[in-house]
């Protein structure tokens, strides 16, 4: 094993952040710490993940949203201390790793179909029958 890879694994384990499993096409809510003067607050940034790149400590993802009719993209490092939490709002069904084509689309053509995970739903236990 490479020493650099080993150091990166140790650093990721030390950070011990809970990062949900998400892919391009998923709608994310990223809570970011924003410093304004002396105080810091948490700001929610919701949009579609259009790309993931890098690996290990250097991994990052790009989130795109439409704000007041203008497209806004923001790149977040996955292990950034400025990220408070990441939540997956909905899963998207896409067939590409990079969704840069969404930059040219507007309205209905920019929509992403929601993914239904049939197989994951079967893993959850069924509700117990009501005792009478």
From Swiss-Prot:
GO BP, one annotated term: translation
User: Which UniProt keywords are given for this protein, alphabetically ordered?
Assistant: Ribonucleoprotein, Ribosomal protein
Superkingdom to which the source organism belongs: Bacteria
One Pfam family this chain carries?
Answer: Ribosomal_L19
Tell me one GO molecular function of this protein. Answer: structural constituent of ribosome
The cross-references to SUPFAM superfamilies, in alphabetical order and at most eight, read: Translation proteins SH3-like domain
Its GO CC terms are: cytosolic large ribosomal subunit
Sum up the protein's function in the record's words: This protein is located at the 30S-50S ribosomal subunit interface and may play a role in the structure and function of the aminoacyl-tRNA binding site.
The similarity annotation says: Belongs to the bacterial ribosomal protein bL19 family.
What is this protein's name? Large ribosomal subunit protein bL19
Q: Which organism is it from?
A: Methylobacterium radiotolerans (strain ATCC 27329 / DSM 1819 / JCM 2831 / NBRC 15690 / NCIMB 10815 / 0-1)
Q: Which gene encodes it?
A: rplS
């Amino acid at each position: 094993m490479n020493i650099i890879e080993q150091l990166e694994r140790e650093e990721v384990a030390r950070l011990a952040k809970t990062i949900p499993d998400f892919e391009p096409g998923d709608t994310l809510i990223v809570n970011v710490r924003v410093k304004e003067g002396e105080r810091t607050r948490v700001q929610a940034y919701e949009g579609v993940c259009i790309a993931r790149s890098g690996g290990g400590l250097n991994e990052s993802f790009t989130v795109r949203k439409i704000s007041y009719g203008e497209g806004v993209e923001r790149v977040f490092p996955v292990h950034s201390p400025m990220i408070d939490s990441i939540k997956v709002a909905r899963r998207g069904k896409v067939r590409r790793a990079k969704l840069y084509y969404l930059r040219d689309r507007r309205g209905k053509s920019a929509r992403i179909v929601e993914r239904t995970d049939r197989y994951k739903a079967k893993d959850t236990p069924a509700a117990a029958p009501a005792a009478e």
